[in-house]
Amino acid sequence: MKYMAEAKTNAMRILDRAKIKYEMHTYPHTEGEAVDGMNVAKLTGQDPVKVYKTLVTRGASNPSKNFYVFVIPVAKELDLKKAAKAVGEKSVEMIHVKEINGITGYIRGGCSPVGMKKQFKTTFHEDVNALDTVVFSGGKIGLQIEAAPADIIKLINGQTADICY
């Protein structure tokens, strides 16, 4: 049996081009089936405090064009009111799962804040500021990337705010 090198994801190529150091973590999964964030933390042996999930929302001011990305700890929930305030919107709502690929280029369970089709305004929950490294989707189910949060936030021109309950 031949083993081929794992193809790099768009997120990994962008990090490589920017010369950002990162570590990959893989976990077993059934092809195409998303795994919830707490299980991803368990399967990769990572502390859930530093494992983050990527959520995509639309703003009320222009629902067909104003999309916002929020990256939060897997054990927390996004507070939509705080999230809206962080991006200067009256309100935001989660996009439908069916829309994820068309908007981001990624699939549910494999949505990375790095390397989306278009770079949307991205906000990390403020807890990330206390971490040396943060773990987030590498752009496909079964792959996580660990890197310094400051490097990722700078790369994607992101921000931090209190956006969780």
Predicted regions and their residues:
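Extended, low-hydrophobicity, polar/charged segments
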Residues: M1-Y165
